[in-house]
Curated annotation (Swiss-Prot):
This is Putative germin-like protein 12-4. PROSITE patterns: GERMIN. Mn(2+) binds at residues 111, 113, 118, 162. Coiled coil: none annotated. GO terms for molecular function: manganese ion binding. Oligomer (believed to be a pentamer but probably hexamer). Keywords: Apoplast, Disulfide bond, Glycoprotein, Manganese, Metal-binding, Secreted, Signal.
Length: 229
């Protein structure tokens, strides 16, 4: 019985440790304002000396109440991210946020956040949103979609491919997203696959997408933009 309890305890500790490592590390003090000028390189950013911290380290005049320009985006969207690189006080706090503006028929293209879960609420307009599950045993990737209206909330699980689309022909939309990391990261699928530097071999992509290399060469020749600011 003692051996059984020992192995059970060991398994539990391993599980807890795994969960702890699956998100940003917890702070060990009241705050750890990022010192962006430190030569130290760690998994995150080192702390500024507490005596040098001021209230402005926790403040950013981000103008998130103002509409952002979507006209320069082929996707028809503009993501204004507030992460630790813009607001040093977020360091070790496991949170960031973004304002997302969508032109009529604009979208935030399929992408993932490798280090964060996202919760999104619609402030203006309507959005068609969804995410796709990881590879399943039945070889199906299930798609979950929903049309959101003003005030609605939707959550995108960490690391899963997801998107938002404004279905209106004449009305813009606005959303606010909160993310469970000070630096959630974003991988826009089309940009990463077709617009990487240097490019992925067209032999690889042609076989992966089961099309000819001419189609792949055309896709890789397009301009793949970043709609995140």
């Amino acid at each position: 019985m003692a051996a059984s309890n020992f192995f059970l305890l060991t398994a539990f500790i391993a599980l807890v440790a795994t969960q702890a490592m699956a998100s940003d590390p917890s702070p060990l003090q009241d705050f750890c304002v990022a010192d962006k000028h430190s030569p130290v390189r760690v998994n995150g950013l080192p702390c500024k000396d507490a005596k040098d911290v001021s209230v402005d380290d926790f403040f950013l005049a981000a103008n998130l109440d103002k509409p952002m320009d979507t006209t320069k985006s082929k996707a028809g969207s503009n993501v204004t991210l507030i992460n630790v690189m813009k607001l040093a006080g977020l360091n070790t706090l496991s949170i960031s946020m973004a304002r997302i503006d969508y032109a009529p028929k604009g979208q935030n293209p399929p992408h993932t956040h490798p280090r964060a879960t996202e919760i999104l609420t619609v402030l203006e307009g309507s959005l068609y949103v969804g995410f796709v599950t990881s590879n399943q045993a039945n070889r199906e990737n299930k798609l979950f979609t929903k049309t959101l209206n003003k005030g609605d909330v939707f959550v995108f699980p960490q690391g899963l491919i997801h998107f938002q689309f404004n279905p209106s022909y004449d009305k813009p939309a606005v959303a606010i997203a909160a993310l469970s990391s000070q630096n959630p990261g974003a991988i826009t699928i089309a940009n990463a696959v077709f617009g990487s530097h240097p490019p992925i071999s067209d032999d690889v992509l042609a076989k992966a997408f089961q099309v000819d290399k001419k189609a792949m060469d055309w896709l890789q020749a397009q301009f793949w933009e970043n709609n995140h600011n």
